[in-house]
Curated annotation (Swiss-Prot):
Source species of the chain: Rattus norvegicus (Rat)
Protein name: Elongation factor 1-gamma
Gene3D superfamilies: 1.20.1050.10, Glutaredoxin, Translation elongation factor EF1B, gamma chain, conserved domain
Domain GST C-terminal residue range list: 88-216
Residues bearing PTM N6-malonyllysine: 434
Length: 437
């Protein structure tokens, strides 16, 4: 298992590739990205650093055994395990294919489009429009490939997914607003599935998708450029003496002291993001405390404790019950792939957990299965339209609102919440269930 030190600068998406790979493989990596241990632009130009890494580039990795390697893809490969690299020659070749595709096809247009919005690069209108069209082509290509796949290569995350996600990261955060990305549902589903994996979240944190396409800011670009030195006037010059005293005071006020440490471009972009609004804030306060029910459900017997608590405290005016059924059972083949559909949906709805609960069950066997479940939502309507990020999967299901007082609803809730019962409306045996809580 690899172990060593990664030199980089903060929020370097190229370094994220190796760090996410290490989360999967168990490689032990120490990150040096800030003074006094590492100062980008200085440390990487010292003779000592250049002896180990002649190109002076970061990220750069130094193993505890003295092994040194630079270039982000090489580092990510080194700290990976066999599953990430591709467990067969064919899979390994496909992983390299997508890693190469990310560098050759995605990085150029992504940089041309995103960098001006961060103030890193000057804006060229025609180049930006060309980059947008190229990004559309790339997202469409991925969308077609992912139509019948959960991940880019095989049925599990590989370096292909890690690399392409990291390369697309700033596009999704900065410019791919909902109206632009909605044409690529399979790509969006895959991207959200990946970034919500625990190994991705450990490095990326909570990724906020773009709500409004960022534009080039000429002022920000000008501020990021090195300032030219202006010739000093001699002390006591005639022009200075002739200035009114009030004008001198105004000049002193205008010359505000510079902050001790300026934010880099990534930090500026993050700081400029609007604070997320609670999509349920408009609803009146409810007496039903969902978290308390979830604790009962997790720690107590479902039939004797959790269900009685649910019906005793359920607020039918503040909450609603829904039955959902997957629309395309004929497309379900291997049961583990069907389970991935459920798990992926849950991961993409992570921000909905405080206001929803669900029990979704896979019934049947390979090539003869179905998916259905019972959901609890805050409010009287389906929650998915409240956020574009929640709309990836829900149209793949039929939704029927349940009457909390009906005998049918009582039976459905009991059977789905306990995973026990006749399930007469299904006609197949329970294979396995998933809980969204």
């Amino acid at each position: 298992m690899a172990a060593g030190t990664l030199y980089t600068y903060p929020e370097n998406w190229r370094a994220f590739k190796a760090l996410i790979a290490a989360q999967y493989s168990g490689a032990q990596i120490r990150v040096l990205s800030a003074p006094p241990h590492f100062h980008f632009g200085q440390t990487n130009r010292t003779p000592e650093f250049l002896r180990k890494f002649p190109a002076g580039k970061v990220p750069a990795f130094e193993g505890d055994d003295g092994f040194c390697v630079f270039e982000s893809n090489a580092i990510a490969y080194y700290v990976s395990n066999e599953e990430l690299r591709g467990s067969t020659p064919e899979a390994a070749a496909q992983v390299v294919q997508w890693v190469s595709f990310a560098d050759s096809d995605i990085v150029p247009p992504a940089s041309t489009w995103v960098f001006p919005t961060l103030g890193i690069m000057h804006h060229n209108k025609q180049a930006t429009e060309n980059a947008k069209e190229e990004v559309k082509r790339i997202l469409g290509l991925l969308d077609t490939h992912l139509k019948t796949r959960t991940f880019l290569v095989g049925e599990r995350v590989t370096l292909a997914d890690i690399t392409v996600v990291c390369t697309l990261l700033w596009l999704y955060k900065q410019v791919l607003e909902p109206s632009f990305r909605q044409a690529f549902p399979n790509t969006n589903r895959w991207f959200l599935t990946c970034i919500n994996q625990p190994q991705f979240r450990a490095i990326l944190g909570e990724v906020k998708l773009c709500e409004k396409m960022a534009q080039f800011d000429a002022k920000k670009f000008a501020e990021s450029q090195p300032k030219k030195d202006t010739p000093r006037k001699e002390k006591g010059s005639r022009e200075e003496k002739q200035k009114p005293q009030t004008e001198r005071k105004e000049e002193k006020k205008a010359a505000a002291p510079a902050p001790e440490e300026e934010m880099d471009e990534c930090e500026q972009a993050l700081a400029a993001e609007p604070k997320a609004k609670d999509p349920f804030a408009h609803l009146p306060k409810s007496t039903f405390v969902l978290d308390e029910f979830k604790r009962k459900y997790s720690n107590e017997d479902t039939l004797s404790v959790a269900l009685p608590y649910f019906w005793e405290h359920f607020d039918k005016d503040g909450w609603s019950l829904w039955y959902a059924e997957y629309r395309f059972p004929e497309e379900l083949t291997q049961t583990f792939m069907s389970c991935n559909l459920i798990t992926g949906m849950f991961q993409r709805l992570d921000k909905l957990r405080k206001n929803a609960f669900a029990s979704v069950i896979l019934f049947g066997t390979n090539n003869s299965s179905s998916i259905s479940g019972v959901w609890v939502f805050r409010g009287q309507d389906l929650a998915f339209p409240l956020s574009p990020d929640w709309q990836v999967d829900y149209e793949s299901y039929t939704w029927r609102k349940l009457d909390p007082g009906s005998e049918e609803t009582q039976t459905l809730v009991r059977e789905y919440f306990s995973w026990e019962g006749a399930f007469q409306h299904v006609g197949k045996a329970v294979n396995q269930g998933k809980i969204f809580k």
